[in-house]
Amino acid sequence: MNPEYDYLFKLLLIGDSGVGKSCLLLRFADDTYTESYISTIGVDFKIRTIELDGKTIKLQIWDTAGQERGRTITSSYYRGAHGIIVVYDVTDQESYANVKQWLQEIDRYASENVNKLLVGNKSDLTTKKVVDNTTAKEFADSLGIPFLETSAKNATNVEQAFMTMAAEIKKRMGPGAASGGERPNLKIDSTPVKQAGGGCC
């Protein structure tokens, strides 16, 4: 039987409340944006199928909205994730400082070889920007993970963020990988080194 897709990737969006995770998801999955998006209670997910290098990839994207206020996202949420997008708000220094804690959550609960992507959202608010692009890029580089600034409002880099993540996962899984499931023989080429104390800015 021929499945309708070659790969199924589970992606997570994590980060502080209000950084625009749901807006990024809505922009990518439905190409919509609303100023008055009400915080999701519990877990929400959307599916979008993309084409990449001649392969059909189904992306199942989970939004952690609601629980992150107390950082009570359960370990089951991370289980089986192929990629995790850590989002902060470029106009909110605290949301950027908290990125380190989110990365620690990933180290604690996600599979060892999960792909990560750092995203600074709300890049359209140039006059309110407090987190410097260079600072965030250097931090991401030090961990060996990709970094992008996005705007869910005007769609800047939203498509690119999810496509980058899908491409990175596909590259890690290699040719002939099954659709989903853990592959213990995957080589781990960019496991981040845990940083010692201090803020990330």
From Swiss-Prot:
- Report residues binding GTP: 17-23, 33-36, 39-40, 66, 121-122, 124, 151-153
One Gene Ontology term, aspect cellular component: phagophore assembly site membrane
Please tell me which stretches of this chain the record labels as motif Switch 2: 65-80
Major location, coarse class?
A: cytoplasm
Q: Which residues bind Mg(2+)?
A: S22, T40, D63
User: Key word Lipoprotein present in the record?
Assistant: yes
Lipid addition sites, S-geranylgeranyl cysteine = C200, C201
Cysteine methyl ester, modified sites: C201
Major enzyme class? hydrolase
| Cross-referenced Gene3D superfamilies | P-loop containing nucleotide triphosphate hydrolases (3.40.50.300)
What does the UniProt record tell us about how this protein is modified after translation? Answer: Prenylated; by GGTase II, only after interaction of the substrate with Rab escort protein 1 (REP1).
Q: Which cofactor does it need?
A: Mg(2+)
What is the regulatory mechanism acting on its activity?
Regulated by guanine nucleotide exchange factors (GEFs) which promote the exchange of bound GDP for free GTP. Regulated by GTPase activating proteins (GAPs) including TBC1D20 which increases the GTP hydrolysis activity. Inhibited by GDP dissociation inhibitors (GDIs).
Q: Which UniProt keywords apply?
A: Acetylation, Autophagy, Cytoplasm, GTP-binding, Hydrolase, Lipoprotein, Magnesium, Membrane, Metal-binding, Methylation, Nucleotide-binding, Phosphoprotein, Prenylation, Protein transport, Transport
SMART domains reported in the protein's UniProt record: RAB (SM00175), RAN (SM00176), RAS (SM00173), RHO (SM00174)
Q: Where is this region: Disordered?
A: 173-201
What is said about its interaction partners and assembly?
Interacts with MICAL1 and MICAL2. Interacts (in GTP-bound form) with MICALCL, MICAL1 and MILCAL3. Interacts with GDI1; the interaction requires the GDP-bound state. Interacts with CHM/REP1; the interaction requires the GDP-bound form and is necessary for prenylation by GGTase II. Interacts with RabGAP TBC1D20. Interacts (in GDP-bound form) with lipid phosphatase MTMR6 (via GRAM domain); the interaction regulates MTMR6 recruitment to the endoplasmic reticulum-Golgi intermediate compartment. Interacts (in GDP-bound form) with lipid phosphatase MTMR7.
Miscellaneous section: Rab-1B binds GTP and GDP and possesses intrinsic GTPase activity.
Q: To which protein family does this belong?
A: Belongs to the small GTPase superfamily. Rab family.
Q: What is known of its domains?
A: Switch 1, switch 2 and the interswitch regions are characteristic of Rab GTPases and mediate the interactions with Rab downstream effectors. The switch regions undergo conformational changes upon nucleotide binding which drives interaction with specific sets of effector proteins, with most effectors only binding to GTP-bound Rab.
Summary of the function given for this chain in its UniProt record:
The small GTPases Rab are key regulators of intracellular membrane trafficking, from the formation of transport vesicles to their fusion with membranes. Rabs cycle between an inactive GDP-bound form and an active GTP-bound form that is able to recruit to membranes different set of downstream effectors directly responsible for vesicle formation, movement, tethering and fusion. Plays a role in the initial events of the autophagic vacuole development which take place at specialized regions of the endoplasmic reticulum.
Q: What is this protein called?
A: Ras-related protein Rab-1B
Q: Which organism does this record belong to?
A: Sus scrofa
